[in-house]
Amino acid sequence: MSGSVLDEEAEKLMDYDYLLEKLYKKVPPKSGTSEYRIPEPQIIRIGSQTVIRNFREIAQALKRDPKLVARYLQKELATAASYEEESGQLILNVKVSRKVVNQFLQLFMKTYVRCPTCGSIDTKLLRQERAYMLKCEACGAEQPVKPI
């Protein structure tokens, strides 16, 4: 009798559907690879400055630290910027259009958020000494990216 219980257990472990179901329970759900959109930047121009009012929301949608995204925009636009944590706004010391900000945010997403292997946005940006690595939570791929 004990032999038949072991045989049933062994057969269950070899069943493809059972193993697949067990695997899906262990793998975290992914956001998907469909077209993912970040919030449209709410821009106000004050003199020679540009204020992105919903910058914190944009950074949260990108799943990245707002200071990191701010540093990227600062570098790409070759200007000084300050992030106000209390209000969640980014102040750029240059006049820039919504279209240009959107283009740089899309480029940031392509380079530092979206997995180049599977297209998922379920990624983490890891810093290893002086290098940055983009690690995908969906497929497990690791890709070096240029430092910000």
Swiss-Prot record:
Example GO molecular function: translation initiation factor activity
Domain of life: Archaea
Keywords, in A-Z order: Initiation factor, Protein biosynthesis
Alphabetized InterPro entries for the sequence: IF2/IF5 (IPR045196), TIF2_bsu_arc (IPR004458), Transl_init_fac_IF2/IF5_dom (IPR002735), Transl_init_fac_IF2/IF5_N (IPR016189), Transl_init_fac_IF2/IF5_Zn-bd (IPR016190)
Pfam families: eIF-5_eIF-2B
Quaternary structure (record): Heterotrimer composed of an alpha, a beta and a gamma chain.
Role played: eIF-2 functions in the early steps of protein synthesis by forming a ternary complex with GTP and initiator tRNA.
Family according to the record: Belongs to the eIF-2-beta/eIF-5 family.
Organism: Aeropyrum pernix (strain ATCC 700893 / DSM 11879 / JCM 9820 / NBRC 100138 / K1)
Protein name per UniProt: Translation initiation factor 2 subunit beta
